């Protein structure tokens, strides 16, 4: 069955369930369809209604799917390991029907995991996830912010700001869009201020501004590498050679 056929089959099961609420055969079929669509908790809720009780074998696929999704959510929240999130999502997706796309929530989680990894390839993968979601709905604020964050991590701050603003035009109350828009704008402003001090030979003020800019988003390796290079040039003009060397070393560690 195609994904749309699974949705149709689910609606048929719901209609049958309304007519005969305790029909175990209907409930088993409904639970299997929910699982095939990636709606594991709904499947488990249906299994709980079945009398006599559904067997462990019947429930195993939905339980494993829910366990892996919960693990992915927990790892996203409490760890910096994007690869562990991807592994959990891969395991969860094994329970989907072959013609069913992963749920939107899972795809956003995958994009978030790619952002956590922060490599050139993974940032491209995050962009691909966002673009796939935006092809389905160009006004998806979460997908717009996901793409904006990937662009920001790649140093494309102007494009990132455009995406955050577009997300806010879709949902003016979306806090993540506000958060990242303000952060990128603040960082750009401080970089420009530091560059202005450097241009006119105000090297101590430039060092101070660049130092403050490094505190705006410690996780953005690409941008912070550039700021460290700029601060290193200031230190060299001030003949603070060890500080200059230290910043160059740190910049290379962040962006080899």
What are these regions (language model features)?
Residues 1-256:
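Alpha-helical tetratricopeptide repeat
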